[in-house]
């Protein structure tokens, strides 16, 4: 890892923004266009991770105190803000171009804050897991681009059921920790493997969705939505990242 990762991520943000202005946006009025659909989506995906990791490394550089940041009220407020920002990104129409970008950036900063404890706990593991996640995502994406039929369109219902199951299992895990005053490592490890598999399938499904939407873009009356595409893929990858990190920690 670069001795000054914040500089690297700042440059990556700048290059991503430059690429977006050059390839993804038209002006008068400002809006997305269908040209370079897939490339534009991945520019936003790269920008997503660059903003989140820049937030993490900036907090580390400034030595933010975990005990002061991750208090009960702050955690609740951050969780609620994160949900509201995500709903805003998904529901606000494309014509509110600047508003959606502000929500997008704020959401990524919050996601960066949630990653900060993992970075502080073990920087070497954090960097290794980041590379592992990138490799898995790249391999899965290539497989879907080569053969989109690897993943069925109908799997989304089962993925959603799986996601609800994981949420319930996490709540049960917290209850176990509360009752026993210590984590159940076997339960946690199995659950983290389930998370990795689930979000591997989500990555494949969302990659196929990107391919389909790129083909149908000019038929869509609402136009392309690179922010929504990128945030879906970002959330898939960050959940996979978390699963891999905690598997290595167990």
Regions found by a protein language model. Give the residues of each.
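A hydrophobic alpha-helical transmembrane-helix feature that marks the membrane cores
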Residues: 1-250
């Amino acid at each position: 890892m670069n001795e000054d990762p914040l500089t690297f991520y700042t440059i990556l943000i700048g290059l991503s923004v430059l690429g977006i202005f050059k390839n993804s946006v038209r002006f008068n009025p400002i809006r997305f266009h269908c040209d370079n659909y897939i490339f534009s989506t991945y520019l936003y995906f790269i920008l997503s991770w660059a903003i989140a990791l820049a937030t993490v490394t900036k907090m580390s550089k400034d030595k933010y105190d975990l005990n002061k940041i991750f208090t009960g009220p702050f955690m609740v407020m951050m969780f609620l803000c994160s949900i509201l920002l995500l709903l805003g990104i998904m529901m606000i129409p494309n014509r509110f171009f600047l508003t959606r970008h502000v929500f997008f950036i704020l959401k990524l900063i919050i996601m960066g804050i949630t990653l900060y404890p993992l970075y502080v706990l073990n920087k070497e593991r954090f960097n290794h897991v980041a590379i592992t996640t990138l490799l898995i995502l790249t391999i899965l994406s290539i497989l879907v681009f080569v053969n989109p039929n690897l993943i069925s369109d109908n799997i989304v219902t089962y993925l959603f059921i799986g996601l609800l199951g994981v949420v319930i299992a996490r709540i049960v895990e917290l209850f176990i920790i509360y009752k026993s005053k210590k984590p159940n490592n076997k339960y946690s490890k199995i659950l983290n493997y389930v998370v990795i598999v689930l979000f591997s399938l989500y990555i494949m499904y969302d990659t196929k969705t990107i391919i389909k939407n790129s083909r149908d873009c000019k038929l869509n009356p609402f136009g392309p939505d690179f922010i929504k595409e990128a945030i879906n893929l970002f959330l898939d990858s960050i959940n996979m990242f978390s699963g891999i990190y905690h598997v290595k920690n167990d």
